[in-house]
Structures are given as C-alpha cells and as structure tokens.
C-alpha cells in the first residue's frame, strides 16, 4: 500500500495518477461501504472516478482472508435481495458470499402478546429474504476491488476544505493530515457526497437537514446459542425496545457448524439512551437479560462477544441535489435500524444514479 494521503490505485505511477485526477468525470467523497460500492458501480459502466476518504485505509493483503480492521467495522449488515443482486451484477458477490448467511425465514413477535407473524421463503417463492454479512468482510472486499480497478483512484487521509461549483463542473480542495500547506485541488463534472450522517460536503453546500433524536441507542454484537439458527431471522418487540437476532455464518463453516461455545448470531437491541451501560459491561448479566426478553426462540444464549453502542437519530437532507453535487448514503438519509433498510436504500440510490450517469 502506498503511503497515506496518496492515491492508492496501482495501475499508474504517482505523477501519472495525480495528473489523471484532473480528468475524472466523478468525484466521490466518503470511502465507506456506500462510497466504495458507488465507485465500483460507476466502473462497471466504464466511468472513472476519484474517491476521497478522510480516514486511513488499512493495509490489506489480497491473499490473507483473516485480515480485519476497526476501520472496516465489527458489525453485521442485513443485505436485501436487491442489494445482493446489485453485487451480483458487478461481479462481486462470489467474493462476498463466503462470509454471508442467507435468511430463509423471518419471525416477528411481541413480548407479552400471543401469536407471531412468520414469513417463509417457500411460501413467498423467493430464494431467500436476503443475506447477513460481516461489515469487516464487506468493507475488505469492496476496498480490494476498488484498489484493483483501473477506473478508480483512491485517496485516503484526505479532509475536504472547500467545494465550489461552476457551470460545467465542481472544484474541491482537500488537505492531508489536516494541514493547510498540503492543500490540493481536484476538478470533476459531478461530485457525489457519501461522507456520512455529519457530512462535510453537505455542510459546505449549505444544505440543511431535518433531524429527530430517537433518544435510543442500538446495542450491537455477536452472541452464541446452543441451537443452530437454521437461517431464521427473529425480531422481538419488548418494553425495553425492539430486538433482532440474525443468523451468522461460521468463519470456518457453513453457518450451522458449532463455533467455540455455540452457534453464532448477530444481535441488535435498541434501548433508551442512558441505559446502554448495563448492556455493555457484564457478559453474564447481558445474556440473562437477553434471555428474559427473547425467551427460547433461539435456544439458550451461551456466550457474548464485545458489544458496541450507537446513538440513533433520523437525519434527512433537505435536498439531495445541489447543482452538480449529489448527496447520497447516510449523508442524505440516516434511518432507524428497526427494519434494517438503511444501507439497502443507499445501495438502491447508488445503483440508480450509476445507471443514470451511464
């Protein structure tokens, strides 16, 4: 990997790459899952792009599948069938599916209420309802694919300073390591901002937002149960907040092989803000509380991994297009995770925009 702050594409020498930057049709700010996916969608249509990411990308070996990084996230994402189809279209799904677990059935219930709703892939006549994938694996494969594409130039450790629009394009200035003397300028026909909920580009364009604080926090982690998941996703509504338990693949098996203490599942539990500490500190207490809220639908919870807490709010950009700039991903709309559609909505936006630009 090249030194931080330089383009990462290995198809050209550094001077050639810097010269090529000025010829790019599209600038993308934000190199997370949405930004990388959009760059790959553009490349699929033969459109060149330059992507700026404020963080340092991790060093990844294409031959070492065990590589992980905190940058690539320790959470899991439920991919809809449409999102899976999009990755199939650009030829990436074969690389992703070894760490993805399909959802064949969905169960929905409410604590203290009789009955439940259940969806089954056979009855609905679909291959599956989607896939649950490790964010670390998804990010790793997206980054490797972007680094290997001759149509994508990656620049990491880059902070955007200014955005100026002209009749026929956009000029953006950025600096490395946050130092003004390192400032550089890029030009392109279109700028697409995928730089997250607190988007710098959105703020520089003076695009306002409508924000709602749910006063809730999502507790996210991985647990193990004594019963195989059988590719069932379960959503349980409890007084403490909605709780989802999703099937996960075993890193060394097919998702139903026993792993360490039991069978792996992803947990997303929404609780009132201020109560998250009790879900994070003591594993035994967390498992006991989880068992009480969930019952035996997934079997007995026997182990818990490290958990993270993520404050929840809804953020909607007042507009998603301003001149030659497009706001996309969480910069455009950050949603509550209860339906698991945030990333999938972003992917639909990215797919449609790439098609329009082609």
PLM features: residue spans?
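Conserved N-terminal helical subregion
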Residues: 17, 21-22, 81-89, 94-204, ...
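FAD/FMN-dependent oxidoreductases across multiple families
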Residues: 277-358
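Conserved FAD/dinucleotide-binding core of flavoprotein oxidoreductases
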Residues: 118, 238-311
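Central beta-strand plus flanking loop segment that forms part of the substrate or channel wall
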Residues: 198-233, 239, 243, 271-275
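Beta1/beta-strand and adjacent pyrophosphate-binding region of the FAD-binding site
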Residues: 18-34
């Amino acid at each position: 990997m090249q030194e931080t702050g330089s383009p990462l594409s290995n198809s050209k020498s550094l001077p050639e790459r810097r010269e090529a930057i000025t010829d790019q049709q599209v600038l993308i700010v934000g190199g997370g899952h949405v930004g990388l996916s959009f760059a790959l969608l553009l490349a699929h249509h033969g459109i060149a792009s330059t992507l700026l990411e404020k963080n340092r990308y991790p060093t990844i070996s294409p031959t070492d599948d065990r590589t992980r990084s905190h940058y690539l996230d320790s959470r899991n994402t439920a991919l809809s069938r449409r999102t899976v189809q999009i990755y199939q279209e650009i030829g990436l799904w074969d690389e992703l599916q070894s760490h993805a677990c399909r959802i064949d059935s969905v169960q929905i219930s409410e604590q203290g209420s009789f009955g439940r709703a259940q969806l089954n892939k056979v009855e609905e006549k679909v291959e599956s309802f989607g896939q649950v994938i490790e964010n670390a694996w998804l990010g790793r494969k997206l980054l490797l694919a972007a680094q290997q594409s001759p149509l994508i130039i990656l620049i990491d450790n880059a902070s955007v300073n200014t955005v100026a629009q002209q009749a026929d394009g956009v000029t953006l200035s950025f600096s490395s390591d946050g130092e003004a003397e390192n400032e550089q300028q890029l030009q392109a026909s279109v700028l697409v901002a995928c730089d997250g909920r607190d988007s710098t580009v959105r703020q520089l364009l003076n695009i306002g937002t409508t924000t709602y604080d749910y006063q809730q926090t999502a507790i996210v982690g991985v647990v193990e149960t004594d019963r195989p998941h059988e590719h069932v996703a379960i959503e349980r509504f409890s007084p403490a907040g909605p709780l989802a338990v999703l099937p996960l693949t075993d890193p060394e098996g097919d998702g139903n092989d026993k792993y360490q203490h039991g069978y792996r599942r992803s947990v997303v539990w929404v609780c009132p803000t201020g109560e998250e500490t009790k879900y994070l500190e003591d594993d035994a207490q967390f498992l006991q509380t989880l068992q009480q809220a969930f019952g035996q639908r997934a079997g007995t919870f026997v182990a818990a991994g490290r958990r993270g807490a993520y404050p929840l709010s809804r953020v909607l950009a007042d507009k998603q297009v301003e001149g030659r700039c497009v706001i996309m991903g969480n910069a455009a709309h950050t949603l509550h995770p209860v339906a698991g559609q945030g990333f999938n909505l972003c992917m639909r936006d990215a797919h449609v925009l790439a098609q329009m630009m082609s």
